[in-house]
């Protein structure tokens, strides 16, 4: 049960931040957001505020922000349509009832002759279906079209995705992965404050364990290690490497303590790691507890992970691709099951790493991903005009289909690794 809760928390938080990025930048650009959904499948919770419906759905493995004009939907009232109009006191249209007119007793019946619900925002027709009573009404920018139980807000063209500048459209799409990186930065920064600092690369000693070789030799926390066996040590990595390579051998530590230099002999204990003898002296990594180190940790950790993930991706394509290199939801669930055993802080760290992964994967220039859409914007920038929407739609559909096939293969591979 703990794993399930952790899995929902991890995926939910990552997806929420990703979609929040799209949502906030869409709002900033003046784009109408029709749906903000976390998860897929049947609705568990739904809430409408103004033009946007917010939903939480059963399967917490994704989400979406549906922006006006993005999927090519269009409300069209052809000449001859008979509809009902609810009017404001100013004689402007607030509701257009296509079906279910009997539930709106005050609706004005009209047979449509001409209608524009995108640019000029008007509806023209014959009142009471009488061709001698031609009328024309302005339509409110937030007017609703009622089709039975379905209510759809009209989309003035200037509120649609495609009406916005190339820069605004690109930033709205890029904001999803960007917010994944922001989430990672926030988590890594918070962890640095909670844990009291961040691992330091200095050549000083951290906590000295009471029963270790360092304690027996007289080393103390804060000692600066100048050299080991005459070999200069400039960083914590140098200390670890020298100790690890000399199990059971006495080492001459030249240290500085309270401004004075002294030599201390230390004999590392021998431990097995991956079938190999390594030296250990019982000293923890030094911690930098300065405010600057804590506040910058989020940025440095996130950047280091981005570099590492891109390196892995590069190796995948240059060294041969295998499905075993990928994890789907089942694989991530299995990994989360292992991470949970180490406590909440480790789960948070895992969340940050996954968020960076999702951000990078979404930026890959593949159809149906944010990176694929950004490539189309680059094409538009170079060419001076966008690609035909129908052609772009076909490419995205094909890309989505291929991604679904890959997801099925990866999930099946995850199941085999987990249960067989």
UniProtKB/Swiss-Prot annotation:
Gene3D superfamilies from the UniProt entry: 2.30.42.10
GO MF, one example:
metal ion binding
**Example GO biological process:** proteolysis
Active site location: 19
Tell me the Pfam families matching this sequence.
PDZ_2 (PF13180), Peptidase_M50 (PF02163)
Q: Which domain of life is it from?
A: Bacteria
Segments traversing the membrane: 172-194, 304-326, 347-369, 393-412
Q: Please verify whether the record's keywords include rRNA processing.
A: no
**Protein EC:** 3.4.24.-
The identity of this protein, by name, is Putative zinc metalloprotease Lmo1318
Q: Give UniProt keywords alphabetically.
A: Cell membrane, Hydrolase, Membrane, Metal-binding, Metalloprotease, Protease, Transmembrane, Transmembrane helix, Zinc
- Name the species this protein comes from: Listeria monocytogenes serovar 1/2a (strain ATCC BAA-679 / EGD-e)
An example GO CC term for this entry is:
plasma membrane
Signal sequence range: none
The way this protein sits in the membrane is described as:
Multi-pass membrane protein
Q: Which family does it belong to?
A: Belongs to the peptidase M50B family.
Where located? Cell membrane
**Could you tell me which SUPFAM superfamilies the record lists for this protein?**
PDZ domain-like
* Alphabetical list of PANTHER family matching this protein: MEMBRANE METALLOPROTEASE ARASP2, CHLOROPLASTIC-RELATED, REGULATOR OF SIGMA-E PROTEASE RSEP
Q: Which NCBIfam families match?
A: RIP metalloprotease RseP
Question: Which InterPro entries would you find in this protein's record?
Answer: PDZ, PDZ_sf, Pept_M50_Zn, Peptidase_M50
Where is Zn(2+) bound in this sequence? 18, 22
**Residue intervals of the PDZ domain:** 176-267
Q: Which cofactor does it need?
A: Zn(2+)
- Primary location recorded for the protein, binned into one broad class: membrane
């Amino acid at each position: 049960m703990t794993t399930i809760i952790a899995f929902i928390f991890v995926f939910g938080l990552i997806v929420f931040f990703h979609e929040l990025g799209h949502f906030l930048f869409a709002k900033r650009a003046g784009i109408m957001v029709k749906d903000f959904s976390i998860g897929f499948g049947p609705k568990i919770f739904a809430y409408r505020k103004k033009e946007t419906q917010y939903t939480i759905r059963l399967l917490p493995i994704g989400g979406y922000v549906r922006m006006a004009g993005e999927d090519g939907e269009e409300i069209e009232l052809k000449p001859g349509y008979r509809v009902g109009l609810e009017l404001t006191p100013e004689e402007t249209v607030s509701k257009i009832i296509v079906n279910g007119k009997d539930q709106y007793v005050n609706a004005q019946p009209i047979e449509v002759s001409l209608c524009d619900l995108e640019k000029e925002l008007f509806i023209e027709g014959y009142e009471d279906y009488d061709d001698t009573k031609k009328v024309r009404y302005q339509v409110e920018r937030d007017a609703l079209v009622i089709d039975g139980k379905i209510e759809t807000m009209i989309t003035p063209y200037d509120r649609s995705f495609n009406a916005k500048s190339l820069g605004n459209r690109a930033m709205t799409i890029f904001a999803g992965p960007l917010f994944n990186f922001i989430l990672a930065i926030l988590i890594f920064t918070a962890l640095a404050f909670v844990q009291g600092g961040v691992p330091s690369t200095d050549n000083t000693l951290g906590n000295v364990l009471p029963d270790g070789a360092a304690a027996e030799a007289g080393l103390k926390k804060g000692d600066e290690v100048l050299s080991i066996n005459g070999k200069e040590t400039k960083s914590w990595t140098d200390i670890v490497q020298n100790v690890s390579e000399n199990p059971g051998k006495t080492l001459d530590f030249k240290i500085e303590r309270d401004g004075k230099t002294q030599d201390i002999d230390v004999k590392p204990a021998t431990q097995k790691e991956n079938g190999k003898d390594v030296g250990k002296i019982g000293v923890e990594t030094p911690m930098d507890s300065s405010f600057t180190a804590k506040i910058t940790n989020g940025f440095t950790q996130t950047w280091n992970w981005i570099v590492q993930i891109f390196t892995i991706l590069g190796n995948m394509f240059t060294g041969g691709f295998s499905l075993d290199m990928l994890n789907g939801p089942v694989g991530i669930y299995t990994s989360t099951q292992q991470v949970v055993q180490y406590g909440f802080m480790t789960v948070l760290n895992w969340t940050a790493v996954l968020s960076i992964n999702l951000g990078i994967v979404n930026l890959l220039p593949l159809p149906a991903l944010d990176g694929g859409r950004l490539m189309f914007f680059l094409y538009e920038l170079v060419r001076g005009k966008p690609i035909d929407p129908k052609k772009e739609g076909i490419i995205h559909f094909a890309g989505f289909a291929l991604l679904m096939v890959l997801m099925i293969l990866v999930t099946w591979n995850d199941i085999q690794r987990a249960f067989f």
